[in-house]
Every structure is written in structure tokens, then in C-alpha cells.
């Protein structure tokens, strides 16, 4: 099967959508399918002409997020491309101008297309004090996904939410986690020593974008409460983003490791003892699965990946937006090394079945079953 994947974010950009889409592309290729990626050009990385089969279009920087871009409309170019080499199916991963162009092109050429719902833009609007536009955002997303035959989502919770908001043909496609990469075996005493920690001291970690919408003030308050009980604790931040400079200047005792990839990222996860994920606005939250696969107990709110996979045997799942309970759970787990130790194995076991090959096989089956004219 020849598949075109359209996305406005892709590695080397680091975010949940980029890494998820790249994983799906790898899985399709491993299954013998041909994959064409259509995405914005990434200045400083992409060469002229493209060094692989990717089809690159013009993009623009996203305000306040250096390093991230959205693709400009490119319907005519995409139609020309697909007329010369028609894909059997199209997957549109992002809802920007490029994704919209791709759905229009697929409709015009009667190529079956499905879409992915990866980001809760409606929640972002509320967070930035623009709650009044939430109905407009949802209306746009409903129209966008209404042009695809199916909309793929990572959790049953999100599927129910979208159906309740009038989205049609929503289908579950669970997320995978690479348990060969993310593993307790990556734990590194050398790395912990670089953090100023031996095995008997506590490393609290956060992995993800360092941005206002991630609710990071709660993570800071939770750590300060931990620190009041355990003077030996250190807080390690893995990632980057617009809030990093301010966070770093106000908290000089925190350790900022910057962006990490591959085995280095896996070592950072596995070398931690407790993972804090305070975000309230994730569509899923891949980092929770990666922490669990690495054998690190997590504290996260009860939605997305945490609702699907986290339990009290391997961390703490907290009632949505209950900040006091989040802090209390973080302190409880930080204080009790003996209780945390068995959680490492149980957290790993809880996600062991989320093998990328199974998820990608399901994805290929969805794409192969798409029929033009079957969208509502």
C-alpha cells in the first residue's frame, strides 16, 4: 500500500505529535508499505533538494514557539504530486493550513483520507484566556475532520468527547511506546552523578515542553513540598520552551538538561525516581507512557494516557485539576522509597503490551479499509 502522511510537525522537532507520526511512518515501512511524508521545510535541517522521499512545502514559524512551524496552503502542489503518483490512502495528522489543503486535494482526486486528532486546541484557547473562541475552535475542528472518512483518536475518553461535540466517524487508535528504547536498564549512575545525586538520593523529573500551558507552576510547588520533606531531592527538567528562561532564573537549584533524543532521552527517564506531569491540556500525554516504560512511577491527572494506563500500583492518578491532591501524592511517593521500589516493575509491566508493531498493524488496517464516500 502506498500511503501519504501529511503533518505540520516532524522530527527533528521534538513533541508528542512529531514523534507519534514518525513512529507510525516507521511502522508502515517496516510492514512493507511505501510512505510519503508531506511537511513544511525545516530551515537549518532540510537541504535543497530533499535528501529523501519527503515532499517539502513552505511554512511559517509559530509565534512564541521557535523551532516549530505550520505549513502554508499547498493544494495545487499536492494535487499535482498525487496525480503523478497516486497514493492508496492519505493520513492527515495536523489541522493547519497544510492539512486542510491535503484533505481538499484528496477529496478532489477521490483518494480515501483519514485524519488524526492529536491536540486539544480548544483547551489551549481557554488556558490563554480566550475561552470565548472555544466554540469557534471546535466548529473549525469539526468541519476539518468532517472532510475525512475517519478521525483517529488515542483514548476512549477523547472519542466520547468528540462524538458528544458532533464529530462523526471517530475511531480509536491506541498509542504505542517503544519499550526497547525506554527501559529501566537505561538507568545511569554516571548521569545521576552529573546531577549531583547518588543512588540513595531522589531525582524528580519532568519531561516535555517548558511552556505556560503545561501547568508547570504546579510541578514547582509539588517539588518544593517534596523538598521540605527530603532535602536531598533534585528536580531535573528535560526539554525546552518559552517558559524555560523564567523558570530557570527563579529556580537556580533546578537542573535543566535541555532537549534530549533517543538513548540519551531514555537514560534521563530511567535515571529518575519520580515523574511529575501536571499538564491539564494534553490530548494524550506520551511522556507518561515513556516514564512508565522506563520504570519510573508517575503522578498525573486522571485523563489521557494516565486514565488509560496509570494506577495506584505504579504511580498516582489524580482527580482532574485537584492541585492539593497532586502535591500530596507527589510528597507521599517521594517520601517512601520502599513503596516506590516495586512500582518500577509494575509501571513497566502496565505498558509492556503497547508494542509499536501492533499499533502500526492496526493503523495499516484502518488505512486499507478506507472507502471514498463513506464519510458522514
What role is predicted for each listed range?
Residues 39, 56-58, 138-187:
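Donor nucleotide-sugar binding/catalytic pocket of nucleotide-sugar-dependent glycosyltransferases
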Residues 82, 259-260, 267-272, 363:
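Short alpha-helical donor nucleotide-sugar binding micro-motif in glycosyltransferases
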Residues 124, 172, 289, 303-318:
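Short acidic/histidine- and often glycine-rich active-site loop of Leloir-type glycosyltransferases
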Residues 197-214, 220-224:
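Conserved donor-binding/catalytic core segment of Leloir-type glycosyltransferases
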Residues 244-264:
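Nucleotide-activated donor-binding/catalytic signature segment of Leloir-type glycosyltransferases, i.e.
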Residues 280:
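Aromatic "clamp/platform" in nucleotide-sugar-dependent glycosyltransferases that forms part
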Residues 297-300:
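Short hydrophobic beta-strand element within catalytic cores of glycosyltransferases
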Residues 312, 316-324, 332-337:
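Conserved acidic donor-binding segment of nucleotide-sugar-dependent glycosyltransferases
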Amino acid at each position: 500500500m502506498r500511503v501519504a502522511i501529511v503533518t505540520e510537525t516532524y522530527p527533528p522537532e521534538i513533541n508528542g505529535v512529531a514523534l507519534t507520526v514518525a513512529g507510525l511512518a516507521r511502522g508502515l515501512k517496516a510492514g512493507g508499505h511505501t510512505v510519503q511524508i508531506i511537511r513544511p521545510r525545516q530551515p537549518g535541517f532540510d537541504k535543497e533538494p530533499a535528501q529523501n522521499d519527503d515532499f517539502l512545502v513552505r511554512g511559517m514559524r509559530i509565534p512564541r514557539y521557535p523551532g516549530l512551524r505550520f505549513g502554508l496552503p499547498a493544494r495545487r502542489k499536492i494535487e499535482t504530486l498525487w496525480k503523478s503518483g497516486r497514493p492508496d490512502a492519505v493520513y492527515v495528522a495536523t489541522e493547519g493550513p497544510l492539512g486542510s489543503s491535503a484533505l481538499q486535494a484528496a477529496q478532489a482526486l477521490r483518494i480515501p483520507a483519514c485524519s488524526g486528532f492529536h491536540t486539544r486546541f480548544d483547551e489551549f484557547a481557554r488556558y490563554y484566556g480566550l475561552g470565548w473562541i472555544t466554540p469557534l475552535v471546535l466548529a473549525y475542528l469539526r468541519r476539518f475532520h468532517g472532510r475525512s472518512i475517519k478521525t483517529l483518536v488515542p483514548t476512549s475518553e477523547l472519542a466520547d468527547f468528540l462524538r458528544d461535540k458532533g464529530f462523526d466517524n471517530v475511531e480509536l487508535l491506541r498509542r504505542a511506546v517503544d519499550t526497547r528504547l525506554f527501559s529501566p536498564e537505561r538507568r545511569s549512575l554516571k548521569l545521576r552523578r552529573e546531577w549531583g545525586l547518588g543512588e540513595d538520593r531522589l531525582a524528580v523529573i519532568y519531561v516535555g515542553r517548558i511552556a505556560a500551558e503545561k501547568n508547570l507552576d504546579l510541578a514547582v510547588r509539588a517539588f518544593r513540598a517534596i523538598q521540605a520533606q527530603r532535602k536531598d531531592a533534585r528536580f531535573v527538567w528535560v526539554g525546552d520552551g518559552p517558559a524555560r528562561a523564567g523558570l530557570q532564573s527563579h529556580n537556580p537549584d533546578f537542573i535543566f538538561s535541555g532537549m534530549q533524543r533517543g538513548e540519551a532521552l531514555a537514560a534521563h527517564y530511567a535515571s529518575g525516581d519520580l515523574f511529575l506531569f501536571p499538564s491539564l491540556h494534553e490530548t494524550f500525554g506520551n511522556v507518561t507512557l515513556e516514564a512508565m516504560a522506563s520504570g519510573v512511577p508517575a503522578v498525573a491527572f486522571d485523563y489521557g494516557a494516565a486514565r488509560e494506563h496509570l494506577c495506584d500500583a505504579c504511580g498516582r492518578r489524580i482527580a482532574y485539576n485537584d492541585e492539593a491532591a497532586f502535591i500530596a501524592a507527589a510528597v507521599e511517593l517521594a517520601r517512601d522509597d520502599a513503596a516506590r521500589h516495586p512500582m518500577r516493575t509494575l509501571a513497566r509491566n502496565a505498558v509492556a503490551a503497547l508494542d509499536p508493531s501492533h499499533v502500526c498493524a492496526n493503523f495499516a488496517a484502518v488505512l486499507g479499509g478506507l472507502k471514498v464516500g463513506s464519510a458522514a
